[in-house]
Amino acid sequence: MQKATYYDNAAAALFGGYSSYPGSNGFGFDVPPQPPFQAATHLEGDYQRSACSLQSLGNAAPHAKSKELNGSCMRPGLAPEPLSAPPGSPPPSAAPTSATSNSSNGGGPSKSGPPKCGPGTNSTLTKQIFPWMKESRQTSKLKNNSPGTAEGCGGGGGGGGGGGSGGSGGGGGGGGGGDKSPPGSAASKRARTAYTSAQLVELEKEFHFNRYLCRPRRVEMANLLNLSERQIKIWFQNRRMKYKKDQKAKGLASSSGGPSPAGSPPQPMQSTAGFMNALHSMTPSYESPSPPAFGKAHQNAYALPSNYQPPLKGCGAPQKYPPTPAPEYEPHVLQANGGAYGTPTMQGSPVYVGGGGYADPLPPPAGPSLYGLNHLSHHPSGNLDYNGAPPMAPSQHHGPCEPHPTYTDLSSHHAPPPQGRIQEAPKLTHL
C-alpha cells in the first residue's frame, strides 16, 4: 500500500490539472473512454505509468524502483506522438490530451519488452492488440532488422532505436538498455558493432597481410563476412591506430631498456657510448684477412685516426684496474716514436691492437701475436692506417685522463697469445 499511496501523491502532484482523478489505483488521468486498456494493464499500469511520467517530466524521484525502470520506461515515456493511442482503445486520444498524457499512455503497453518498436508502433495502425506485450528483448531485436521498423523507431523520435541502442530523439534514452544492436539496424545513433570471432579472425588475417585495404578487396570481404563496407573500413582504421600505439609503446620500452626486438640493436648502445658496441665491431675484425678491414673496424669503434674523443671519454672507467706494470713501461712509451703506446721493444711503426694498446709488429711475443695478427707484419703499407704517432702527440696522451697505465696494463696483460682474445671479451664488457 505504500507504493500505491506514493504513486498517488506523485501522480496528484503531476496530473492534478488534468481530467478526473477518481481513486487510489492511479488510473483516470486521461479521457474517460478507455476502460478495456485500463482493465488489461491493471497490475503494471499504475507502476510503470507513474514511473514513466515522473521520469518524462524530469522529476527525478529518489525511489529505487523508479531508478530500476530507467532503461525500460524511459524510451516509451519520451515518445510523444506515435504512441498516442493504445491498440485496445476504440478511438485515438482526443486532441486536448497533452504530450504528458500521451507519454503516460505509452508507458502502459511496454510490459516486458519496453524498448520495442514493433510493427504497429505508428499511430495509424490500431490493430495487433497484444502480441508485442509478450515479446522479449531478443525477439524485438530480431524484428528491428527490417528497415520498416527501424524507420518507425527513428521517425517516432522516441529514442527507442534497435534493441537497446538509444535513438537521438529521446535525450536520456540513449544507451538505456545497453545492448548492442545488430549491424543492419538503421538507428539514428550508430550502435557499437559486435563482431563474431570468425569475422575477427578473417579481419586480423587480412590486416596481417595488408594494413590498407583496397576497395575491391573490401567489397569482397564485406560479402564474405556479412558486414558492410563501412564497418570493415572503420575496423581497419581502428586496427591501424592500435598497431601504431603498440609500436610506439614498444619503441619507448626498448629505448629505456635493452635492444628492441624489432628495432636496430646498436641504437641504445650508441646512445650510452658503452664499450659493447666497440666489442661487437672489434671481435670479427681480428680474423679479417686484410689490414684495411681492421683499420675500418677501429675507426668505427674508437675513431682513432681522425678523432680521439670516444676513448678519452671512456678511459675514466678503465683506470680502476691496478696499473701494476706502469712504471717500467712508461719510459719506453715516451721514448718510442713520439709517445705511442706499446711494449719496450717497440721500433718504428706501432700497430694498434684490440686491447687498446699499441704493439710493435716485429717481435713475435709482444706485438702481432697478441691477437694473432701475424698478417700485419707483412703489410708495412697498411700500418699507415694504424700508426698513431703523428696524430697522437704526447699532449693528447697527457690530456684529461691519463691513459698510459690502462693501455700498457691491457697490452701487458694479454701477453700469452691464445688466452689474450679469450680474456679480452669479459674485460671490455665490464669497462
UniProtKB/Swiss-Prot annotation:
Region (Disordered): 63-125, 137-192, 246-273, 381-431
GO biological process, one term: angiogenesis
DNA-binding region: 188-247
SUPFAM superfamilies in the record: Homeodomain-like
Skewed-composition ranges (Pro residues): 83-94
Comp. bias (Polar residues): 139-148
Protein name: Homeobox protein Hox-B3
